């Protein structure tokens, strides 16, 4: 099973919590990844997330989600929140996102 297929499965599991995986970017999206590459994941949060996980509990949940994805894919991952990207990050990241 490919990493993209696994991401689609994770996306379905996590969306009930209001955590939405939009896609990947970086070396994996450009097919330039190496064995040492991490996987960069673009995501956004929906209202359900804030309702279920308010305050610091939300930060803990994000860390749990990051660990779940990393363990499932057996890779280090970086999470980038779509709604909080700087203008510079938007310019580079949004142009190369491979949506799942």
Regions found by a protein language model. Give the residues of each.
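Catalytic core of pol beta-like nucleotidyltransferases
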Residues: 1-23, 29-35, 48-100
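Short hydrophobic/aromatic beta-strand micro-patches
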Residues: 42-44
